[in-house]
């Protein structure tokens, strides 16, 4: 394993990526989580934006989340794949008022699973629930069925409502807290999932440098 990645994992650095179509509110969700305030008129992400935050899981474990907010525009999709590398958690975001963005969720999940074999937890985020339900283009039953059929969880959220954003990241944080390096393994690059799986050992020794940083 790349020594940089190994060091990050040993220091409880967990890579979380946000994927989804353009305009669904990925950057606004990240901004709400980091700064606890809403933001409007966000410029489209180009490539990816990076931020990190130290958090505490329900089990008391302190984690460092490395959050990658990726571009959703179709012209950047080939670039976005680079940021899948070594992700352990994924938030797949869509806009409840945009049917096409929900239809695209299958593409994003399938693309992730084809190109990344380290992702432990996928959470589908139905965003913009602050908008009147008369304007929703996706029903909860559809979301529930889709996630059941595609083996992932879902949550409703609004980047304007901090409690919903904290809730979705709380779910991710608790899942990430189940992951740890096996100290007894002869291979230092093996990570096992407590009471869940035999482990993740297919890491790619490369991290893309084409990103911007959120301070």
UniProtKB/Swiss-Prot annotation:
Residues annotated to bind GTP: 20-27, 69-73, 127-130
UniProt short sequence motif Effector region, positions renumbered to this chain: 42-50
Principal cellular location given in the protein's record: host cell
Sites bearing Cysteine methyl ester, chain numbering: 212
Membrane topology type: Lipid-anchor
GO biological-process terms attached to the record: protein transport
Residues of the propeptide: 213-215
Protein's cellular compartments: Host cell membrane
GO molecular function, one term: GTPase activity
Lipid-acceptor residues (S-geranylgeranyl cysteine): 211-212
The keyword Amino-acid biosynthesis is assigned to this record: no
Residues in the signal sequence: none
PROSITE patterns: RAB (PS51419)
InterPro entries membership: P-loop_NTPase (IPR027417), Small_GTP-bd (IPR005225), Small_GTPase (IPR001806)
Any GO CC annotation of this UniProt entry: host cell plasma membrane
Keywords noted in UniProt: GTP-binding, Host cell membrane, Host membrane, Lipoprotein, Membrane, Methylation, Nucleotide-binding, Prenylation, Protein transport, Transport
Family the entry assigns: Belongs to the small GTPase superfamily. Rab family.
NCBIfam families per UniProt: small_GTP
Role summary: May be involved in protein transport.
PANTHER family, per the entry: PTHR47978
Name the record gives this protein: Probable Rab-related GTPase
Species of origin: Acanthamoeba polyphaga mimivirus
